[in-house]
Amino acid sequence: MLDPKYLRSDIAEAAARLATRGYVLDVAAVNALEEKRKDLQSRTQELQAERNARSKSIGEAARRGEDVAPLKAEVTKINEELETSKVELDALLAELKVIADAIPNLPSDTTPVGRDENDNVEVRRWGTPREFSFPVRDHIDLGEAAKGVDFKNGVKLSGSRFVVMKGQIARLHRALAQFMLDLHTLQHGYTECYVPYLVNPDSLYGTGQLPKFSQDLFNTGIDGEGEEEGKVRKFSLIPTSEVPLTNMARDEIFDEQELPIKMTAHSPCFRSEAGSYGRDTRGLIRMHQFDKVEMVQLVHPEKSWEALEEMAGHAEKVLQLLELPYRVMALSTGDMGFCAAKTYDLEVWLPAQNTYREISSVSNCTDFQARRMQARVRIDGKPQLLHTLNGSGLAVGRTLVAVIENYQQEDGRIAIPAALQSYMGGLTHIG
């Protein structure tokens, strides 16, 4: 959520910056609602002051032995007007909140301006794509040949965009997640967390999935136990462990010396993939359920840009140790996620597709999520909004795809990257 004070004082500037994201802010409509809010708020305060003054007069008149019935009648009338004014004000504030909740974060000054992914800017590359002396096979063919990727049973058990992994492919998938966690916790300073896979609406609001992106979620329709009577709180499956990790800061005030807080978690992620019809219908690239190792940082508001570069480096280190060629892209304003002020995508080379594909997104959300969550840090004795960052470190399934395709051998076997062999019991090849 953007700063309401900024929207009120610099709405034209905000609208111009949001327009680079393809978001049209109706300035005239917002200004009209704001004027109405100020009038209603002023009227409500005047009525409260008038009621308090009249109520005080009743006590004074009673002490003098005067008839207080006329004054009580006036107070009753004022209370009726006040109640009407409060109802109108609450309705107007709710309308303004609906608008505010739908406004994305402001792009940073260093975010490339563009309409979509075609306007993303390459920042750097690492590694050289391997030249094969034999016809390249894709991960589906290789995985099925190794009897480790079973889409048929995935469809039978659940439907399209699900898979069953078996044998050494399943083991390799597990090894990748363990390797990533060990790297981030032992070398990069993150604390490993095991988090709930079911979260409440407050959590999804805090990290920006609700209310705008409800169609992307899998909702259980089940209430949590012990909730307040009359308050419906449905559980949803997490689309990423960013949601529970970041929301642990909700309604908290940290001391300055506690920051940065760096957390990581390995979890399944559940996404409806609404709007992805016809895209990546084969293989492991776009699934309803996939595993990811997530990184989250809660930082001092003056240090988030430094933290963004650091987090991108942490994700890159995974690919470097696996010796997988990749490139780093700065996303354009039109391609960024809702909460991000700036995002780097890491794209890994997939030989069978002869292109780079996204394997990680690392974003600085500045104070956007923190404002929704009221996550703060005490600086010079005064609570201020902290900054939140999140990034994939990495998407495990897509990393598996990259390893299978980049490490394929002419005889159909899959070589195990040196960094993973200790996690595979010394195994050097699959197949």
Curated annotation (Swiss-Prot):
Annotated keywords: Aminoacyl-tRNA synthetase, ATP-binding, Cytoplasm, Ligase, Nucleotide-binding, Protein biosynthesis
Subcellular location field: Cytoplasm
Domain notes: Consists of two distinct domains, a catalytic core and a N-terminal extension that is involved in tRNA binding.
Keyword flag Glycosyltransferase: no
Pathway linked to the protein: Aminoacyl-tRNA biosynthesis; selenocysteinyl-tRNA(Sec) biosynthesis; L-seryl-tRNA(Sec) from L-serine and tRNA(Sec): step 1/1
PANTHER family: SERINE--TRNA LIGASE (PTHR43697:SF1), SERYL-TRNA SYNTHETASE (PTHR43697)
Quaternary assembly: Homodimer. The tRNA molecule binds across the dimer.
Alphabetized NCBIfam families for the sequence: serS
Any one Gene Ontology molecular-function term assigned to this protein's record: serine-tRNA ligase activity
Major enzyme class: ligase
Name this protein carries in UniProt: Serine--tRNA ligase
EC number: 6.1.1.11
Gene: serS
GO cellular component, one term: cytoplasm
Pfam families found in the cross-reference section: Seryl_tRNA_N (PF02403), tRNA-synt_2b (PF00587)
PROSITE patterns: AA_TRNA_LIGASE_II
GO terms for biological process, alphabetical: selenocysteine biosynthetic process; seryl-tRNA aminoacylation
